[in-house]
Amino acid sequence: MITTVQEISKWRNLCFIRMQSRKWYPVLKKTPLVADGRKIIKHADKVPHPGEIIHPFYQPTAIEQFTACATEYNPSLLDGKKIAPSLIKHPVSLKTILVDSKLKFDDIRGVNRWLMEFVARRQHQRNIVLTPASKSVRSFHVLHLSSTDIAKLRGLENVLSEIENTNDLQSRVESVNNELQNIFDRDSKQTRLFCEDILAYLIKNYGNSTENLILLINVTEMQLFSRLDQMKAMNIILYHILCKVEANENPPYSPTLVTALENLLAAINNRFFPGRCENSLHPIVIEQLLSYFIKTGNLNESKNFLGHLIKKGILPEATIINRYLEAIDVHFDKSTKIFDIRSKFAFIADLAPIIENYGTIDLFKFLIPMCRHFDELCSLLNIIRKSNNAKQAVDSTLPIFIKKVLTFTKDPMINSGNLSTVFNIVSPIYGQNVPSEFVEKFILSFALQGNYTMMAHMIDTYKIKLSHKYQLQIIRALKNSERNHALKNTGAVGYNKEFKKYFIEKYLNCTEREALRP
């Protein structure tokens, strides 16, 4: 059995399958992007490098690889359709742009090497091990303030009480900041009184209202360029701020609060880093920020923090991932438009290791509608088949898979073959005893294709009881098939009039038979 690209390459000179030559699309093609209405030049003169493809779950099977390596003219994957989401360099501006690429090669040369690298990258994603972040928060709660130190903060607490009803935020920030400075001026150099401990204490005890929390966030930002000189200190403060945000408000958050927190994050980046600060943030704080940005609907920042967690080998909580997927659906309104699906792939590209090894039912349900080719659907189904919760996942998703199979083409014979493939993939999960409720859905789907042979085979093999209600469903499906495929495959084995007559007489009651008479 040929299972590797190396073996495939040995056979390529023996097995040439000449396929109909397809005209290559223009090297440069102007395409409007729905997102901003601008037009860009889409670079589409070659198959993207395997590292440029961001599809998180497509894996060509051994047969797909063999066919590509054995096809002399225009070998392809995914039938050469323009559905492989890729991040490529614009040929002129050299900016990275998101496009749907065709995995269609000019000729057979180099196909095996391309496949070897693509498969190796997919294997690397499968081998990534993720572990949940430690939930120990003791280090965030240990504030190094003695009772003597807290007594020194009485003046600061009084200032907070006095300015509580003041509307001028800037004057309130200056008042608190001045009192902080007075505390440090009065304090002896021997005392271990640190700014981060004071701010964390104030946030924990006085940040119970949105107004006070905004005030303390602004004070923290002012202290960044004086006494807050370590990221360890900022981890403590951010943890307490985000805990209060979670406790005080339900989304949508106050715009002033959102602005204050995002200004603080920008100031932290400017203070400590030329770019972004994720590498120095504690995983728990990163997860808090991820949750916060998901709730505010900021998908770009959500993607950044989610991707950073995964790169650090940390498995985000399932509830956070589900909320992230929901936010994507809300943003795109569950759209199945080509551009929206391409953009969705950009937001879930980092989830590849989670899909492969830690996929949940909700995640799989999110991915099924994104498949634009049957081979993508099979890749996803094979991932589910190998997962630890395979049976539960298939129980919940199989009806969606069956429905999705019929969306790729209108050809009843191709649809019948694809339905059979799906059935053969899932049946071993049930020990060949596929539940009758699923078998009945397959039968109805075969009826929609006018495939009398497969209907009869499944009814007999799985001893399906044909109730009056179910027979009516079959009849409706067959009538739809006759309308949709009136001129196709009428003489094919399993679809012709003889098979129709045999099926009607053997499986339908007298009353139901009349409904299908010509």
UniProtKB/Swiss-Prot annotation:
Sorted alphabetically, the keyword list is: Mitochondrion, Transit peptide, Translation regulation
The transit peptide is at 1-19
As for subcellular location, the record says: Mitochondrion
Name the principal localization, coarsely classed. mitochondrion
Task: Quote the Pfam families the UniProt record gives.
Answer: AEP1
Molecular function (GO) terms for this protein are: translation regulator activity
Keyword hit for Transit peptide: yes
What is any one of the record's Gene Ontology cellular component terms?
mitochondrion
Asked whether the keyword Repeat is assigned, the reply is: no
According to its UniProt entry, the function of this protein is described as:
Required for translation of the mitochondrial OLI1 transcript encoding subunit 9 of mitochondrial ATP synthase.
Q: Which family does it belong to?
A: Belongs to the AEP1 family.
Q: What is this protein called?
A: ATPase expression protein 1, mitochondrial
